[in-house]
Amino acid sequence: MAKLLETFPCVPSTERGRGILISGDSKSDTILYCNGRSVFIRSLRQLQDVQVYGEHGYAVTVARYSPNGEWIASADVSGTVRVWGTHNGFVLKNEFRVLAGRVDDLQWSFDGLRIVASGDGKGKSLVRSFAWDSGNTMGDFDGHSRRVLSCAFKPTRPFRIATCGEDFLVNFYDGPPFKFHSSHREHSNFVNCIRYSPDGTKFITVSSDKKGMIYDGKTGDKVGELASEDGHKGSIYAVSWSPDSKRVLTVSADKSAKVWEVAEDGTIGSVIKTLSFMESGGAEDMLVGCLWQNDHLITVSLGGTMSLFSADDMDKPPLLLSGHIKNVTSLAVLGENQKTILSCSYDGLIVKWLKGVGYSCKLQMKDTKIKRLAATESSIFISGYDNMVWRIPLTDNGYGAAEHVDIGHQPLDISIAVDSPEATALVSFDSGVVLLNGLNILSKIDLGFAVAASVISPDGKEAIVGGQDGKLHIYSVSGDNNLKEEAVLEKHRGALTVIRYSPDLTMFASGDANREAVVWDRETKQVKLNNMLFHTARINSLAWSPNNKMVATGSIDTCVIVYEVDKPASSRITARNAHLGGVNAVAFIDDCTVASSGEDASVRLWHIEPQ
């Protein structure tokens, strides 16, 4: 049996020039955010407590708790809203197609019976309010001419709805049934976010014109604005009220977050605190989302980093939560410290995770796309979609300065002889391999066939190269760093995708694009375990347990399968739906724990119980 131990989640999806709208539930102290086709439910009391909902067919844009916390409404780029339970396996209550295009925001009414959604209507309705159980429309929302970026339900009687969008307008509706009441054009650029105060007396809008406007919650009349003296110098993307309705938190493209004191009558808002951040100096420091929930002030940067401040002590350094935004392509576990996991994503981000803790630190490689990662205790090697192989030293505080070498070809696979004195690296390309000592090219060898995968033995004395034709070519590595072919093995019916040696070097395993894996005896060159055909699609990754007894495979069919070498393949252990969109990498942490990563940009740890 495979049991999920931990999830190291991705961070919210972000888009430059647009804000994101995160939300939460004050009773359970959990937050909701979206990435890809998944909604992530994350506890602020226990940060390792993460749940994932992945039933949308398209990228999810927004998710909100119902007032009683029992239901969640989430929406996607197709205009679909799904209402599902927070308990008992996320049971689906209803699904409605509410807009013709992307939903940018949605809100529940305070009684939990109605939902309003806004976004891109593609020439049709831009805002719609409907009953949560039947989907019946509750009114007409005229007045907007372009995409409606945000909407808000008044949290007290009488019912009111306020909206804002790309036409620079703030519109106000009363009902139900809802009908147009008034419109305001105080803003001179996109109005990015609109939020009612918890007591319902006011609502506030923030805009790319660097301004915030305050309106009466019942009549919709403008009553004040945020003072500009100490205000933001860039577009304001999001705003969130304090639980007592006296203060607001705003975030901006100027890389700052500010806390404002709002007068009781709403006539003015004044900055009382500008929150401090550690900046990397790049555009990823721009702040695009925020949430004030209980004692937590949460900000989200363009790079996805979530900073958690305490409302009681805003001078206290924030707790940082980070991770990947894009799909995780490769994993490595540091040998002597098997609680440390390294992961990389194709957008150039390398993240260090600690088992039982989660996020530790990260390194953003500028202008580099990463496809493969291999590691020793002292350094990591990465390769991407150009001709470069990078070496990055590992330090106590994170990472050292990166260096690279141009091998003249796009790398396909990379492996390191971790037990050899020189820590030789083998890098394969489309027609051959390169042997590296650090960043020194020892030899470049054209093998005369189409290469698909490769590996070098931990002692550096042997290499195996797999071809597009499914053949395994075994080479001895000579003292002059040349390769001598010793054998050719034929069993696979598809191009090789991955080859790995067992830790004790008595076996090796291979996987192919035709969903088959094979375990081989290294000495006899005979098949030791076959019929490993239980994936339904291409195998992307393969790993051995430290005790040499198990092999794990990951596939684009979303499953991780673990085979026991001394048992028939039919007695496999399967983690189904391990990663939405497919599994890209697997690695053993210890004899009974497997790490996996995939298209959902997350890393998961699984406890494996042998049959």
UniProtKB/Swiss-Prot annotation:
Tissue expression? Expressed in flower buds and flowers.
Single GO cellular component term: Cul4-RING E3 ubiquitin ligase complex
Q: Which GO terms describe its biological process?
A: actin filament depolymerization
The disulfides recorded in the entry are none
Q: Which GO terms describe its molecular function?
A: actin filament binding
Which Gene3D superfamilies does this UniProt record tie to the protein?
YVTN repeat-like/Quinoprotein amine dehydrogenase
Q: What does this protein do?
A: Binds actin. Enhances the F-actin depolymerization activity of actin-depolymerizing factor (ADF) proteins.
Q: What is this protein called?
A: Actin-interacting protein 1-1
